[in-house]
Amino acid sequence: IEVPNKLREIVSFKEIISSDIFRKGQSKLTLALGKNIGGESIIADLTKMPHLLVAGSTGAGKSVSINSMVMSLLYKASPKEVKMLMIDPKLLELSMYEDIPHLVSPVITNPKLAAEALRKMVFEMERRYRLLAEKGARNIDNFNRNVPDEEQLPYIVVIIDELADLMFASSREVEDSITRLAQMARAAGIHLIIATQRPSVDVITGIIKANFPARISFQVFSKIDSRTILDSQGAEQLLGKGDMLMMLPGSKITRVHGAFVTEDEIHAVTKFIKAQGSPDYSFFETIPTEPPPVDEENEDRDDMYYKAVEFGESAGEVSISSIQRRFKIGYNRAARIMEMMEDDGLVGPPKGAGKPRDFMRRSN
């Protein structure tokens, strides 16, 4: 049984970052979180999480915790070592970090632009994977050890302060990008910190939750909300103002009193950092938002096309959906294959939406 103190101590952020455990942390992505019920400083390594989901009701301490994490990164890493993409649809919490040199883009407040930025991050992840493959490196650390300083890749931390606003604006697109990043971006050095005050299943979907084994819950309204975040109840009984339950991969749920960082401290740190240099947004602006166009001369009639032709020939009819199901490919690819079959005179005229088209036998 845990009985709260009548007079609660405020855990200062300064105290946590001054502790031996934080100062000795080797990772550039070390996060200062707070203290446990025994009074010990608690830190976490984002590279091992490798992504973090934070939830809690209004006033429970969620946004203060996000600020503590951002400040931890600013204390630990230079702009050459860690970059950040900040998405803040609420327009309130992350605006204080505008123009710091760690940013790859101005703080994004428009949900549509946020969806586009997440799509850019997916393309950047894929680019990094190609670079790693060329060097035979398994992850970003191995890569950076084997290339000159000017070719080294920084970590990128994507921070979203209110997921619900993005999900309501363009849920499918946002969910797809977040899922791809959560599944694959760790080796490429891209990590996500996502916060929401609406821990409902339409915001924290099953797919998103499955890819975020590290989760923090502040006080929530109900047992259902607690189970949505932590897969167990308990968060509804927290005291608010930084009281949280932390679930990390391979560990039991731990109760932590979150570190409190003041606005004055944030302004002092960001003012100092801005004086060291200005942000460079040119790299992020050049990342495409659409996949590169296919070289039609060389790529059109590939193995997949000829397999689809054989499938249509054996079935006697073919549709875009049947090609999708048979070969487990997306709609756009299947539609392109159907267009090529039509160009080659292999399919009859359309019979209506969703209906298969007759396959015309090939002449030998």
Q: What spans do the regions from the language model cover?
A:
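The conserved Walker
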Residues: 57-59, 196
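P-loop NTPase motor-domain active sites and their immediate coupling elements
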Residues: 1-30, 35-37, 41-43, 48-49, ...
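Conserved nucleotide-sensing/catalytic segment adjacent to the nucleotide-binding pocket
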Residues: 104-122
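Hydrophobic positions on the alpha1 helix immediately C-terminal to the Walker A/P-loop
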Residues: 65, 69
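Conserved lysine of the Walker
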Residues: 62
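Active-site catalytic microenvironments for nucleophilic, acid-base chemistry
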Residues: 72-76, 344
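Short hydrophobic/aromatic beta-strand immediately N-terminal to the Walker A/P-loop
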Residues: 52-53
